[in-house]
Amino acid sequence: MIKGIAGVGGTALGVGGGVAAPPVSAAAVGSTLLAGKGVCLGLGLGLGAWGPVLLGVAGLACAASLCDYLKNRKAQAEASAEPA
């Protein structure tokens, strides 16, 4: 063991050694809301607070499009199943 490089309890600092970060601070590293950087997605797109809004609008548009597609597909299947 190298002098002066000791962790908690005398273990050498290396793989598995050292002090574990508390869960809240570990979560704050990955979360922009907990880190105090404001409301943003943190993707580096430069959208700021508009990022979550645009993502929500895009998600709603995709969901509406999917529902419309499934409804039309079901109507076409019922129309082709009816005898002419």
UniProtKB/Swiss-Prot annotation:
Disulphide connectivity of cysteines: none
Transmembrane portions of the chain: 4-24, 41-61
Ranges facing Lumenal side: 25-40
Annotated knockout phenotype: Deletion of any 2 genes encoded in this operon (mamC, mamD, mamF and mamG) decreases crystal size regardless of the protein combination. Deletion of the mamGFDC operon leads to smaller magnetite crystals in irregularly spaced chains, but no other phenotype. Deletion of approximately 80 kb of DNA, including this operon, leads to cells that are non-magnetic, lack internal membrane systems, grow poorly, have reduced mobility and take-up and accumulate iron poorly.
Topology of the protein relative to the lipid bilayer: Multi-pass membrane protein
LG repeat as annotated region, ranges: 41-48
Cytoplasmic side stretches: 1-3, 62-84
Keywords: Biomineralization, Magnetosome, Membrane, Transmembrane, Transmembrane helix
Signal peptide: none
Induction comment: Part of the probable 4 gene mamGFDC operon.
One GO CC term on file: magnetosome membrane
Entry's localization field: Magnetosome membrane
Main subcellular localisation: membrane
Miscellaneous section: This bacteria makes up to 60 cubo-octahedral magnetosomes of about 45 nm in diameter which contain membrane-bound crystals of magnetite (Fe(3)O(4)).
Family of the protein in this entry: Belongs to the magnetosome MamG (TC 9.B.95) protein family.
Role according to the record: Plays a role in regulating magnetite crystal size.
Name assigned to this protein: Magnetosome protein MamG
Source organism per UniProt: Magnetospirillum gryphiswaldense (strain DSM 6361 / JCM 21280 / NBRC 15271 / MSR-1)
Name of the coding gene: mamG
